[in-house]
Every structure is written in C-alpha cells, then in structure tokens.
Amino acid sequence: MSNGKSLIILASFLFLHFSFITEEALAQEFSYAHATVITPKGVSIPVEVSDTPEKRSLGLGKRDKLEKGWGMLFVFERRIPPSFWRKHMRVPIDIIWLDNQRIVELAENVPPPQEGESPKVMEPRLPSNFVLELESGRARDLGLKVGQKLSFKF
C-alpha cells in the first residue's frame, strides 16, 4: 500500500474516532480547580472553578446531581452580562450573578428543561464577572440577597 493511501486511511480513522467524542466524555476530561466561596455569615461553600470557555459551556450539564453543599463558580475575564441556558441540565439549581463578588442578581429554583423543551436562557440585567451555581434552595437557606458581598479563596 502506498504512503498516500496509508495516510488517507489513518486520517479517516482518526476523524471517525474523534467525531464520536461526546460532551459527556469531554466533561470527564476536564480537571476542575477547587476554591471556596464564603458567605456574609461566614459559611464556606466548596466550589469547582469553571474558568475556560469549554468548562463554562458545559457547566453543570449532564450531571445527575450536585454534591451536597458544593457549587460551581464560573469566572469571566471581563464584566459582561453572562447568559446561561439550561442545556443538558438534569437538576434544578440557584444561579447567582456577581460583579466583583457582590451579588447583582439571583435566580432561585431554576428547573431543568422538560423533554422536548428548548432550554431557557437566563441573563442578568447588570454586568458581572462571576456566576455561582448552587443546589436549588441553597441561596435561600444561606440568606443570600442582592447587594451582599461574597469572598473567594482560590
């Protein structure tokens, strides 16, 4: 077999192999750094840090649950009104938008999309550079409110 044919066969194999990688498989490839978010009342919340476009795109999607007491902190390089949609979400969550660690908006008990439903897009009215996702009801349990400042330990 000529080198040209071997190269074409190899390239075809690699293309087919990599075209079947799913978002779920990609999620397993991500290694998330951990940090701690501290509430005004001093409660520490361990979080996974989602700080790349790929990690932010997947977020908590494809997970059947959040670990009890844990959350995910999305970090953006600049202040924007980051939109979030619930694609591939399986559990309800609270979404908290922060501008320089100050809460600018809360969306509590946001349900996952129903089967066949287009995921709802959620966007804050004000720019922010962090978004915290927690298990549904946790923001209320912690007494979190717009205007409060959270602390981060990276």
Name each model feature, range by range:
Residues 9-20:
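Bacterial N-terminal signal peptides
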Residues 21-27:
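Sec/Tat signal peptide C-region and signal peptidase I cleavage site
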Residues 2-10:
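Bacterial N-terminal signal peptides that target proteins for export
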Residues 4-5, 18, 132:
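Generic alpha-helix initiation/capping and coil-helix boundary signal
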Residues 28-154:
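Compact, glycine-rich, soluble single-domain proteins
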